[in-house]
Amino acid sequence: MTQKANWNYPTSVRFGAGRVAELADVCKAAGIARPLFVTDPGLAALPMTRAAVESLNGLGVGVFSEIKSNPVESNVAAGVAVLRAGKHDGVVAFGGGSALDVGKVIAFMAGQTRPMWDFEDVGDWWTRADPKGIAPVIAVPTTSGTGSEVGRAGVITQEATHTK
């Protein structure tokens, strides 16, 4: 049997020293006027993170850092609540795999009305999502290895069953 496939991963990647200074411009280009900056508690306390947040000061930036190293659904729910309460219209996910995964899922869930688990990466469950309810997301990886910045999925633990 001959297999044919097409692969399209239209993720724009910027890299190089000092590129974080472009965050405000990247947000504006993505239509984000009030970004929610999502990171983990350890990174939130570092000068490089403060500098990244300060680069967004001209925008209505908020910060969310209530993320466990192996994120759980309550981390996502808390982030979605902060996003909605602050009227944020996009996400800047900053950190390693956990922060990037939570940031992506917060952006995905921003305008959804169904529970997060209705969108597991199983079969065609993704078709249940309202595409208009997905906020734009900008991922800034601070580690190498997970590739979360270019993937569509986020690994989140369901607290009731302890499954991912």
Where are these regions (language model features)?
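Structural motif
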Residues: 27, 83, 129-130
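A general structural motif
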Residues: 32-34, 88, 134
